[in-house]
Amino acid sequence: VSFLQSRLSGKRRPVAAAGVAFAVAAGTLVTAGPASAAEIYDVTTKPSGSYLSAAGSMNLATYGEHISTCDNSSDGAGVIGYWKVGSGGTVHSLYNGKGRATCEDVNASAPESSRIYLKVCLRNNGTVVSATCSAWESFPAGA
C-alpha cells in the first residue's frame, strides 16, 4: 500500500488499544472494561490542474487530539492545513513543506466534548492554491 493509498478522505479508522489484546493473549486479563480506542479522521486536497486528488491530507487522531498535515505527492507543492476548535474558534495553521511522504504534527489540546474542524490546501511558492482546498469538515475531538 503506497503512502497516498493509505490516506482515506473523510473516513474514520479505529485504532485498537494494544494493551488489552496483549493481556488477553497472555491470559492475565481478569476483568474487562470498555476498550479504549481512538478514531483517525482524514480530509484531503482536491485535484486542480496538474495537482492530483489527495496530494495533501490533514489527519485528526482523537486520542490526544493530534493533528497532522501530510504531503502525499511529489508535485513540488507544500501542504497547509487549517484547524479550529468549534465552528467559531480561532483558526490555526500547520504547514508541511518537507516533501512527499512527510507529515507535520501538532497537539490540538481540545476538550473531549468539542468538535474540531479541518481544512487542507496545497501551497506552491508561498501561495495557497485555493482550487485544491477541501471544505471545512467537522469531527468529534474525543474518542
Language model: regions and residue ranges:
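Post-signal peptide N-terminal regions of Sec-secreted extracellular proteins
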Residues: 36-143
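N-terminal prepro-regions of secreted/extracellular proteins
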Residues: 1-53
